[in-house]
């Protein structure tokens, strides 16, 4: 239990520091680099899930966890060996109450992701999909790659606030498709993942530009949204349209908040 707690703390600390460092390392391309960073997160998360299943079946659960921890250990040792002058100072952590809308949007982003992704298998099984077919639907997460990578490109040209609003308009369209029969339902989930990761990249980039205090609080709010999703989704197992309605209300709230600012 202690090891799992430490693992979770480390998993939250790394992105908080990373998104705070990006504007310092790449001041002229902060939005683009933040988008690429989030695309890497999507790819790594997807590969981790796939490899975990394959390795656990072939080697065992403990051996799979050990194998997957080796790249993180190697990167940690590499970072320890870097000269101190290569890393710009972050400065003191400042906690800005004006960033409350940003924290709220962070919570909404992961809530929508996990809340609907956890409910989708039950909906698909009710519609007659086989378990193997349900598993393939989760390849939709791969569409978060172009969504994340394009977010910085669009933010640099349209402005981050406008791009953020466009992303959540796309989320609302995707939620509407979830209420339709297949194949529209599957297309809606694909679009949902793409637009959620677009918005997530922009929100992460905005948090990073405000310093380590804001970026750390943003990451904490993000994971809090995921925790709430895990607690809430069992209440909607047989009420998928109602769950989509809740998701639409939260997406509309995020659209109205639009906390991403050009800096």
Language model: regions and residue ranges:
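Helix-to-loop junctions at the C-terminal end of transmembrane segments
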Residues: 147-160, 237
